[in-house]
UniProtKB/Swiss-Prot annotation:
Function: Catalyzes the specific phosphorylation of the 3-hydroxyl group of shikimic acid using ATP as a cosubstrate.
Protein's pathway: Metabolic intermediate biosynthesis; chorismate biosynthesis; chorismate from D-erythrose 4-phosphate and phosphoenolpyruvate: step 5/7
Top enzyme class: transferase
Homology family: Belongs to the shikimate kinase family.
Organism: Caldicellulosiruptor saccharolyticus (strain ATCC 43494 / DSM 8903 / Tp8T 6331)
Protein name: Shikimate kinase
Assembly information from the UniProt record: Monomer.
Key word Cytoplasm present: yes
Subcellular location: Cytoplasm
Length: 172
């Protein structure tokens, strides 16, 4: 089975939905942010603060190179992974990429008490979310499937991903 790759903006449900999909299919979940944290032995926030976004993205690329070679897993990526076309190509070689969409307003609600997101630290959170989403949306739209997490619970989103994925797999 091809990997199920989840991407989308922070707060779109990648980790939660990824966990549900992996549990339902009885396969492993690999969270690229968790892999980066293991490599640096720092939180994402600390990595950005100490090393900057450039070093974070370099590490993210190494992690993508490694996890994209795995088989039969759910891969939950960081929200900015799609900004590098090489990351997308690596993930697509052995996977199907699902973009989890959430509106800026819902992302703000989901992240309102979360102060660990380095790209939302300065200025108005909603403005930052909208600005970053506008930059990333063309990249997200290049994914294989879009799942709207504004209108689906995590459980229903997981079921929809599994349904799409199994239908696609049966045609291979």
């Amino acid at each position: 089975m091809k990997n199920i790759v989840l991407t989308g903006f922070m707060g779109s449900g990648k980790t939660t939905i990824g966990r549900l999909v992996a549990e339902k299919l009885n396969i492993d979940l690999v969270d690229t942010d968790s892999e980066i944290i293991k490599e640096f032995k720092l939180t994402i926030d600390q990595i950005f603060e100490i090393h900057g976004e450039k070093k974070f993205r370099e590490c993210e690329k190494r992690v993508i190179e490694r996890v994209s070679k795995l088989e039969n897993v759910v891969i939950s990526t960081g929200g900015g992974v799609v900004l590098d076309p090489e990351n997308v190509n690596l993930l697509r070689k052995n996977g199907v990429i699902y973009f989890l969409y959430a509106s800026p307003e819902n992302i703000l609600k989901r992240l309102k008490d979360d102060n660990t997101r380095p790209l939302l630290k300065n200025g108005d959170k909603l403005s930052n979310i909208i600005r970053l989403m506008n930059i990333r949306m063309p990249f997200y739209k290049n994914c294989d499937f879009e799942i709207n997490t504004d209108i689906l619970s995590p459980e229903l989103a997981a079921e929809k991903i599994i349904s799409i994925h199994m239908a696609k797999e049966s045609k291979r």
